[in-house]
From Swiss-Prot:
This is Ribosomal protein uS12 methylthiotransferase RimO. It is an enzyme of class 2 (transferase). [4Fe-4S] cluster 2 binds at C149, C153, C156. Residues 6-116 form the MTTase N-terminal domain. One of its GO terms (biological process) is tRNA modification. One of its GO terms (molecular function) is protein methylthiotransferase activity. It is found in: Cytoplasm. Its cofactor is [4Fe-4S] cluster. It catalyses: L-aspartate(89)-[ribosomal protein uS12]-hydrogen + (sulfur carrier)-SH + AH2 + 2 S-adenosyl-L-methionine = 3-methylsulfanyl-L-aspartate(89)-[ribosomal protein uS12]-hydrogen + (sulfur carrier)-H + 5'-deoxyadenosine + L-methionine + A + S-adenosyl-L-homocysteine + 2 H(+). Catalyzes the methylthiolation of an aspartic acid residue of ribosomal protein uS12.
């Protein structure tokens, strides 16, 4: 009689980088014969991959750990919040193991301790696909190119959790990308803590892929990814000068004309307090130049309002900058102090919560008007749409200016008998728009 496969559940919180970590853990466990299940009652043990970026994320992590303990009882904790195990154990002393991010072997060993792998497991029978276990839909995947960050932004504690920049070998990254494309992935989302710093830590050394030399550098990586015939979308791009080299690749259709650049603010004073580059005037000139070279370019960004020391004048400067920049996709957060962040030690006036809320409301209204106007210009144009979902009401997809989960959608009505499926790319004509989404008809 064959022994029953041990079963593990996974809850992955936080950013796409953490999701990739969860995929790596599950891939290893699947290779050892574990079954991945979706419910507490079916799992022999539950792994919670936590987020510790801001206090609300920590609170959510603690809440989810508590729920897993209540519903299952056997819980292993990993991820960014696991850097300080004492905080987790103070609230949930019954957790079986606590580890920080990237500690894959320790997590797998902790699972072994709770529910050992089957001794009769035959890896030739329970084959794991070459691309590994993926927690995203089959048609898109995150491609993590590095870990850690060399910056010291005053509001952030990521370097203390994930360490300094460590770039993956370029050949390994491209091999993974090729496996993903071969498995049916239509969109690669390139992620890291600082995508444009890729290769800095290894002095852009030359690696090899498909027998050809390739520099460990963002531009060369993008050139190689652009040869694979799928959408390539760049996230978490820090605006170094060499980012300019990517624009011709976008204009030529090699990679998507989409840049996710977290500017965070525009006021020179606030940027200095944040320890961010304070070249907001040059940034506007660069954006103008980028769009002249690549008119289809979409720029997404995130900002923080209510940072210590932010005055009404600083905030108005930010709104005026947004008007000039005409960014396409924008997110905004109210500043929240993070334990251990250098910003807590700033000699700067704390912005009251009601003022933060007021500025957030005004920021969102201001940017919504900009986004709506920019999307209105898409009406009547033909666009290629990657389908994410299909139901009896039609299809929901994204075009090149929409990243999954964080940007807008394209809603498409389908005729009876349509064979459109998730993962298909179809041509559509835009018929309507609001501040976030588009409506279109299939051509």
């Amino acid at each position: 009689m064959t022994a029953k496969a041990p079963r593990v559940g996974m809850i992955s919180l936080g950013c796409p980088k953490a999701l990739v970590d969860s995929e790596r853990i599950l891939t290893q466990l699947r290779m050892e014969g574990y079954e991945v299940v979706a419910t507490y009652e079916d799992a022999d043990v539950v792994v919670v991959n936590t987020c510790g970026f801001i206090d609300t994320a920590k609170a959510e992590s603690l809440e989810v750990i508590g729920e897993a303990i209540k519903e299952n009882g056997k819980v292993i904790v990993t991820g960014c919040m696991g850097v300080d195990a004492s905080v987790i154990r103070a609230v949930h002393p019954s957790v079986l193991s606590v580890t920080g991010p990237q500690q894959y072997e320790q997590v797998v060993n902790a699972v072994h301790d709770v529910v050992p792998p089957r001794k009769d497991h035959n890896p030739l029978i329970d084959l794991v696909p070459p691309q590994g276990v993926k927690l995203t839909p089959r048609h898109y995947a995150y491609l993590k190119i590095s870990e850690g960050c060399n910056h010291s932004c005053s509001f952030c504690i990521i370097p203390s959790m994930r360490g300094k920049l460590v770039s993956r070998p370029v050949g390994d990254v491209l091999d993974e990308a090729k496996r993903l494309v071969k498995s049916g992935v239509k969109e690669l989302l390139v992620i890291s803590q600082d995508t444009s710093a890729y290769g800095v830590d290894v002095k852009y050394r030359t690696g090899f892929w498909d027998g050809q030399p390739v520099k460990t550098r963002m531009t060369e990586l993008c050139q190689a990814l652009g040869s694979m015939g799928v959408w390539v979308r760049l996230h978490y791009v820090y605006p170094y000068p060499h980012v300019d080299e990517l624009i011709p690749l976008m204009a030529a259709g090699k990679i998507l004309p989409y840049l996710d650049i977290p500017f965070q603010h525009a006021s020179p004073k606030i940027l200095k307090l944040m320890k961010r580059p304070a070249f907001e005037d040059k940034t506007l000139a660069r954006i103008k130049n980028w769009r002249e070279q690549c008119p289809d370019l979409i720029i997404r960004s995130t900002f923080i309002v209510g940072f210590p020391g932010e005055t009404e004048e600083d905030f108005q400067y930010l709104l005026d900058w947004l008007t000039e920049a005409q960014l396409d996709r924008v997110g905004c957060f109210q500043y929240s102090p993070v334990e251990g962040a250098p910003a807590n030690l700033l000699d700067a006036a704390i912005v009251p919560d009601d003022v933060k809320q007021d500025r957030w409301d005004r920021f969102m209204a201001h940017q919504q008007a900009i986004s709506a106007a920019r999307l209105q210009m898409k009406i009547g144009k033909e666009i290629e749409v990657l389908i994410d979902e299909v139901d009896d009401r039609g299809a929901v997809g994204r075009c090149f200016f929409d990243a999954p989960e964080i940007d807008g959608n394209v809603f498409i009505g389908l005729e009876d008998g349509s064979t459109v499926q998730p993962g298909d790319k179809i041509m559509c004509r835009v018929t309507d728009a609001d501040e976030y989404d588009l409506w279109a008809e299939m051509l």
